[in-house]
Curated annotation (Swiss-Prot):
Its EC number is 3.1.-.-. This is CRISPR-associated endoribonuclease Cas2 1. It comes from Methanospirillum hungatei JF-1 (strain ATCC 27890 / DSM 864 / NBRC 100397 / JF-1). It is an enzyme of class 3 (hydrolase). Homodimer, forms a heterotetramer with a Cas1 homodimer. Pfam families: CRISPR_Cas2. The lineage of its organism: Archaea, Methanobacteriati, Methanobacteriota, Stenosarchaea group, Methanomicrobia. CRISPR (clustered regularly interspaced short palindromic repeat), is an adaptive immune system that provides protection against mobile genetic elements (viruses, transposable elements and conjugative plasmids). CRISPR clusters contain sequences complementary to antecedent mobile elements and target invading nucleic acids. CRISPR clusters are transcribed and processed into CRISPR RNA (crRNA). Functions as a ssRNA-specific endoribonuclease. Involved in the integration of spacer DNA into the CRISPR cassette.
Length: 95
């Protein structure tokens, strides 16, 4: 099972919409590292589910969400100044 590391950034004007984006990202186990940036790791299946949900639920042009897959080597070199990066969240899917 392949685990994908992610960085998700968003720009959402309305508080109600922004809170909904945050709840979805937290539901999938992503961790907030900056005000509008989350990171974490998901299985390919969970990543596809999250992306489908984001596309389905956030259709307003004013809601901008960027999901970036990050390779293992890049995650190892990542630096978060003045804080520690959250431990990579390894999630497993029971089939």
């Amino acid at each position: 099972m392949t685990v994908k590391h992610l960085i998700v950034c968003y720009d959402v004007e309305k508080t109600k919409d922004r809170n909904k984006v945050i709840k979805v990202l937290e539901y999938y186990g992503l961790i907030r590292v900056q005000y509008s940036v989350f990171m974490g790791s998901l299985t390919e299946t969970r990543l596809h589910q999250m992306n489908a949900r984001i596309k389905r639920e956030f259709t307003k042009p004013s809601i901008k969400i960027l999901v970036i897959e990050v390779c293992n080597a890049c995650m190892e070199r990542a630096l978060l100044v003045h804080e520690e990066l959250p431990k990579v969240n390894r999630q497993f899917e029971v089939i």
